[in-house]
Amino acid sequence: MRERETVFDRIGEEDQVIAFFPCIRFENQIMLSFRGQAYQMRKWTDVQKMEHDMKLLDELNHMYKLVNKLFIVCIRKKIKLIVENPYSEEHFLRRYWCLQPSVIDKDRRERGDYYKKPTQYWFVNRKPSYNFIFETANDNAIPSRGKDAWKERRKADYELTGAETVKVARSMIHPDYANRFIREFII
């Protein structure tokens, strides 16, 4: 018997949860840290790198348990769930998880977002709608500046997203993209 109420106790089969699950330990750049090849680690000793690896692995394990618990609860309670996370071949969930994404959006600019940002979505207890949207998507893309686009991003570029830093700008979703995604896959 559970000791306390959870947020899931008030969510039922008629509800729908959309989760932007933290990706910091699942995304492909984390592999650079595990190998000790991240730029900020260039002067670290092997011992420092290994100690850091153990911490990263603990954090990865914690996040992996959380995402699994979220899915398990929603599957058992028949709660409709949509989870968003970045997509890449090296992404931890893409490589090692038993669930495959329902939708992979390889270029979000085609649906009106600021950046390409390949993204994967898991749909639980429901299927994507795959509605056909007749109007063309607005071109809200912020111009790329080559291979190291994020390093060369100018303040004027990322301020278009409403963000105050380039780090926050990467997480911003253009309202046109959100609207189009909802109409195409959810409604």
Which residues are covered by each model-predicted region?
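Conserved active-site and SAM-binding loop architecture
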Residues: 1-187
